[in-house]
Design a protein with these regions (language model features):
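Hydrophobic protein-protein interaction segments
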Residues: 2-143
Length: 143
């Protein structure tokens, strides 16, 4: 359903790249600043665990270079592990969507993280998702 909500991410992309480099992220994610700052703090935490990971270092450098907000948050030296959160998004067809997010580090491989989005019922997100899923299957491009 990610594609139905946010559109197709380019091959080889990541959600972090989408957050900082695709203008659609700032339009669709209502609490973008909160999630972007938390993403920077999580990247700092990952760098502490994997200081010699060249791909991670390159990603962090790219984000800090291309996005002034990311550079500012990086300089605050915040570190954040993955945690529970709520994310609100706006879709141009169905309106606001609200999700609870649970992040779990897998016990046998702490380098892999399971992120589960569940629909918050108060905004009717659960009712809107089947429509978005069927709309996405029909091959619509992101609006």
């Amino acid at each position: 359903l990610l594609t139905a909500v946010l559109g197709e991410l380019p091959p080889g992309s990541s959600f972090v790249r989408f957050m900082f480099f695709d203008p659609l992220a700032r339009e669709r994610i209502v609490n973008w600043e909160h999630f972007a700052a938390a993403s920077v703090a999580a990247l700092r935490g990952e760098l502490g665990r994997h200081p010699h990971d060249g791909l991670l270092v390159a990603l962090i450098d790219e984000i800090r270079t291309r996005d002034q907000d990311a550079a500012t948050w990086w300089n605050h030296h915040g570190v954040q592990d993955y945690a529970s959160a709520a994310k609100r998004m706006v879709h141009p067809v169905v309106g606001e969507l609200s999700f609870d997010i649970e992040t779990v580090m897998l016990p046998h491989n702490t380098d892999q993280v399971l992120v589960a989005y569940t629909a918050q019922p108060d905004l009717g997100t659960a009712r809107k998702l089947p429509f978005l899923a069927s709309w996405s299957v029909q091959g619509s491009d992101r609006p």
